[in-house]
Amino acid sequence: MTTHRAGKMFGSTCLALGIFAVSLAASAEDVKVTLTGAEEVPAVTTKAMGEGTIAIGKDMSVSGTVKTTGIEGVAAHIHLAEAGKNGPPVVTLIKGEGGAWSTPPGAKLTEEQYKAFKAGNLYVNVHSAAHKGGEIRGQLKP
């Protein structure tokens, strides 16, 4: 009977460790981001601002929301470029209510984009009618 209990305990321990390992692999890195006109390239003088959290999983999944104020945003994206440079959009954000912009369900980065994230070379950009290239921006710094 002792052997049976030990075997059950060993099996339960292995199962728990396996679940823990899977959850670590899928865990996300939460990055707080603040968006301002000063971060734009070139800089924009604006009272608009934004803040939020973007989570990037080790499986390259992307989730999160940024909340903006003082801006009537017409589009928002996560772009690929280092601070001080402009780059192409890689994830289009979905406009919600009250100035909220969220990642679409199932959003994922490519391997190249994930490496760029780890190097600090992704940013969130909110565009307005007055500033089509972007009015506020915030670099994602892991």
Task: Label each PLM-derived region with a short phrase.
Residues 2-4, 18, 23-76, 80-142:
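Metal-centered catalytic cores of metalloenzymes
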Residues 2-14:
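Bacterial N-terminal signal peptides that target proteins for export
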